Amino acid sequence: MTDRPIMTTSAGAPIPDNQNSLTAGERGPILMQDYQLIEKLSHQNRERIPERAVHAKGWGAYGTLTITGDISRYTKAKVLQPGAQTPMLARFSTVAGELGAADAERDVRGFALKFYTQEGNWDLVGNNTPVFFVRDPLKFPDFIHTQKRHPRTHLRSATAMWDFWSLSPESLHQVTILMSDRGLPTDVRHINGYGSHTYSFWNDAGERYWVKFHFKTMQGHKHWTNAEAEQVIGRTRESTQEDLFSAIENGEFPKWKVQVQIMPELDADKTPYNPFDLTKVWPHADYPPIDIGVMELNRNPENYFTEVENAAFSPSNIVPGIGFSPDKMLQARIFSYADAHRHRLGTHYESIPVNQPKCLVHHYHRDGQMNVYGGIKTGNPDAYYEPNSFNGPVEQPSAKEPPLCISGNADRYNHRIGNDDYSQPRALFNLFDAAQKQRLFSNIAAAMKGVPGFIVERQLGHFKLIHPEYEAGVRKALKDAHGYDANTIALNEKITAAE
């Protein structure tokens, strides 16, 4: 018989019997002093933590970021210097589904990256799409509510989704991507990733540049049709997890080409679009993507819960040489992501091993739930405030960003006034070939099943402003799929409104 470790309680005491509860007599009731049973049941009651409010269903892996290009003239970030190799963690996800949702659903895929750099953790928290549904964070909770379950029926509501989208024309770009082939990828090895937001670079000379990050899959793109996805879900709800885990276990390491688009700081005032608008892309003809490196995933987690479910990504985690921008959605996420982790994982969530930086950490935060580092991180128990005379940690002036020029009156500006929400979706639509357009029309028609006619007509009006062919194609697909025709509900509502 081989030597095996002794089973103990969480306090370290050996357990004599893990098969039978302590009872008063063979048939008698269980005794309250059976602490082993109480401990076991209590731990089971607390095994589940709150799932993420968004992006709950996810898949993760470790890897390496290798920089092969030279953008040192734009940024001082050590992680982006030529030849740098940085360990990292990636977590992919769906947006709307809960932890038990099927993987093969039509949805945006989250693309969250944590780079363990020598200057601290750098998190890039993006999606597999370069744009998003809303541009003002005040509307983000409302949008997410439409993707979740109806409070009365507890069912997903196509009516809520299309009602919100049809009242929010800024969503057209993302909706078009979502309903296209790329809205239903076969897995996450065959998708692109995007930082989506506009970030900034700054160099040793104090010069600032605006930047967008792209991760282009080197495996090619693969997508399901709706019918194919239904068959996949009938076989397995874990198709993406199975694919990613198996590929890495078999040594088929997925790779992404890393690119950046760089815009001189003053160009932001010259572009015909707002370069900080999350519903817009930067045309590649104006700001060509620059190849800077390769991201490879090459190791599976040993424990999903501790290394993927406990992973906490936040856009607030940046390093010297990388900064933020006036992107309103980014500004809100800087706060909301870290705050969500404090709620879901605890005050000191960054002490969880998967979230710990690889460099030394020194700060004056103290006490609180989950404090496992001895009170303070200053290295001296007498230095628990700042400034102090007891060799506590001090600032590093070289990490200061260059000043950002901001002007304007404080107000709640209508973000739809003077904003063109149709040109970029039109450019995307015109890139589709005939077969891609037909699938787009069919996917939209399928997603509109059961939606009231007046909402359908409102959305069709937006599609027509993108391109008459877009509106006509969806209208025909609706008739073919559901027998939808000239809508009397919409007409009656217009008459009522006029009266």
From Swiss-Prot:
Names of required cofactors: heme
Gene3D superfamilies: Catalase core domain
Main location: periplasm
Chain intervals for the UniProt region annotation (Disordered): 1-25
Active site, UniProt feature: 55, 127
UniProt feature coiled coil, ranges: none
Residues the entry annotates as binding heme: 337
GO cellular component assignments: cytoplasm; periplasmic space
Keyword Hydrolase part of the UniProt annotation: no
Keywords, ordered alphabetically: Heme, Hydrogen peroxide, Iron, Metal-binding, Oxidoreductase, Periplasm, Peroxidase
Subcellular localization: Periplasm
Quaternary assembly: Homotetramer.
Entry's family note: Belongs to the catalase family.
Protein name, entry field: Catalase
Organism for this UniProt entry: Brucella suis biovar 1 (strain 1330)
Gene name of this polypeptide: katA
